[in-house]
Amino acid sequence: MPDSTPPPPAGGPAAIRVTGLRQAFGRHTVLDGLDFAVARGEVFGLLGPNGAGKTSTINVLTTLVRPDGGTAEVAGFDVARKPGEVKRRIALTGQSAAVDDVLTGIENLTMLGRLSGLSGRTARIRAGELLDQFDLAAAGGRRVGTYSGGMRRRLDLALSFVVTPEVLFLDEPTTGLDTRSRRELWDVIRRLADAGTTVFLTTQYLEEADQLADRVAVLDGGRIVATGTAAALKSRIGGDTVELHDEHGELVREVPTDGTVSGLRRALDTLDEAGDHGVVSLRRPSLDDVFLALTGAGAQHRSPAADPAASVLEESR
């Protein structure tokens, strides 16, 4: 039988390869035949509302749960047949930081280094390097219980790099963070990707995927309904729109346009001929528009039906 899994994009062999992946909890199917591949060094974003199957996908790929059907390979090893080999090559960070509040930042890192087989001296050196890399050097001697949410999340990421992973899995890493902390964490993730780490990111923040991911897949009801670059997915739902808002900010009218100068002139002429008055703005398609078109609901406005796998991820941490 020929392999129907999409080939990885240009740039090298696949870091992750998934074919016909299925997962169910009782009679509830959460993953219904997923097919995708992620190239080495790529940032791949998996989008979807709560309950779409994002955490279930992470759980299978990180060997926390065996798949009920299909195959999945990570870093060249089958997650069901060679889970130990997979675990040695990956790191996982979830929605809450798995750090010890009583210890200082450098103590957290040094302890994990020792548990990972590093000598005391090497573990301390590595801890210092990671504090610098993740912008925590000034706080390294403080107890983690005094850290802000963003600092705790950065320390959690740093712990994943005590032994550098081939593939980093991030399950909604900025959930609960304020805007500033979220953007600071984005900067850290970008630096990791620029250094060559493969990043598999799940998120329901569409701006996050737009900012970070080389490619995105939209997951809905346990199935991938679209895959591509953010730009390619946006182009599927049409062009730009000229919007007219009244003095209260309410949308009065919108006119489609192709984004060219002549197209904009025609749109403005249409509004002028109709005698409409107000504030004009140009709106380009967003990933939120893509999500609405593909699933019928915005990612952050879906009913929060829990992914049954979420508890598995939290219990593992």
Question: Each PLM stretch: what is its role?
Answer:
Residues 110, 114, 121-139:
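Conserved ABC ATPase "signature" region
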Residues 168-171:
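Catalytic Walker B motif of ABC-type/P-loop ATPase nucleotide-binding domains
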Residues 227-228:
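ABC ATPase "signature
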Residues 232-317:
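Short, charged/small-residue-rich alpha-helical element at the C-terminal edge
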